[in-house]
Amino acid sequence: MEGVVLLHKPKGMTSHDCVFKLRKILREKRIGHTGTLDPDVTGVLPICVGRATKIAQFLTSETKTYEGEVTLGFSTTTEDASGEVVETKHVDRVITRKEVEEALVTLTGTIEQMPPMFSAVKVNGKKLYEYARAGQEVERPVRTITIHEFVLLDDREVFEGETISFRFRVTCSKGTYVRTLAVMIGEKLGFPSHMSHLVRTASGEFLLEDCISFEEIEENVQNGTVESIFISIDEALSKFPKMVVDEKQAEKIKNGMFLKNELQITAPFITVFDKNDRCLAIYEHHPKHPGMLKPMKVLVNNQELKL
């Protein structure tokens, strides 16, 4: 049993909770997720099973797309709807569509963002949420992120009321805290704010419409069709350039054999396949020997090569 499962993560579960539940359903210990989603966030969560856990790191650096909702009028400790109210300031004026769109434009491109206190970012060996739960405030590292697209989905021309909410879609780089973006939008508009809803609709090439629920996974297990839920390792890595080696080279790959970059591939990672179209390893450019490739992750062992 191996491959990538596109889980439609439900609300109220951590990514680790999802892994724990899948281990029980699939009766497989080698399971890992490809990037944390907050408990309140739903949507695309690629899960690697069996031998596919070796490729998890190559699926985490993908661009992500989310659809969510910002609420102006009060902020929270966690920057989302699960936290305690920190500041309240009723929206005492009409906010126009143009104002909101201009705020989104200023947050598009390469920007700096400070991670929230309630996050897993580590400072001095401790996670920020551990400091937050102890009531401690620490200096947080500013990170550079890229917002590829930030679009207002609400079709209203004006927004009014003591609290107002509007929907958005954002496509961003790995490491972006969308709830912090919601706070930044509020700052641009002059009001405390938080993220009131969020769903991840895409993680790289993996889309929400292709995801399945826990119930569907359990049904496939019961029906004996569990293999149908997996995206193969080869398919999951299809975005990377590919090299094919002969049988003799394939036997040496497990032992860390370097390869010549005969195809002059410039991409950072290269997948290496055998004549049977099975992915053997992922290679990268050798830092000291131009024109050579070195193994970054070997996906098979000698016993598997003889099968």
Curated annotation (Swiss-Prot):
Keyword annotations for this protein, in alphabetical order, are: Isomerase, tRNA processing
Statement: the UniProt record of this protein carries the keyword Lipoprotein: no
Q: What is its EC number?
A: 5.4.99.25
Q: What is catalyzed by this enzyme?
A: uridine(55) in tRNA = pseudouridine(55) in tRNA
Keyword hit for tRNA processing:
yes
Q: Its GO biological process terms? A: mRNA pseudouridine synthesis; tRNA pseudouridine synthesis
SUPFAM superfamilies according to UniProt: Pseudouridine synthase
The UniProt GO MF terms for this protein read: RNA binding; tRNA pseudouridine(55) synthase activity
Q: A single Pfam family, by name?
A: TruB_C_2
- Enzymatic class: isomerase
Q: Which residues form the active site?
A: 38
**Highest taxon listed in the record's lineage:** Bacteria
**What family is this?**
Belongs to the pseudouridine synthase TruB family. Type 1 subfamily.
Explain the purpose of this protein: Responsible for synthesis of pseudouridine from uracil-55 in the psi GC loop of transfer RNAs.
Q: PANTHER family from the entry?
A: PSEUDOURIDYLATE SYNTHASE TRUB1, TRNA-PSEUDOURIDINE SYNTHASE
What name goes with this protein? Answer: tRNA pseudouridine synthase B
Organism lineage string: Bacteria, Bacillati, Bacillota, Bacilli, Bacillales
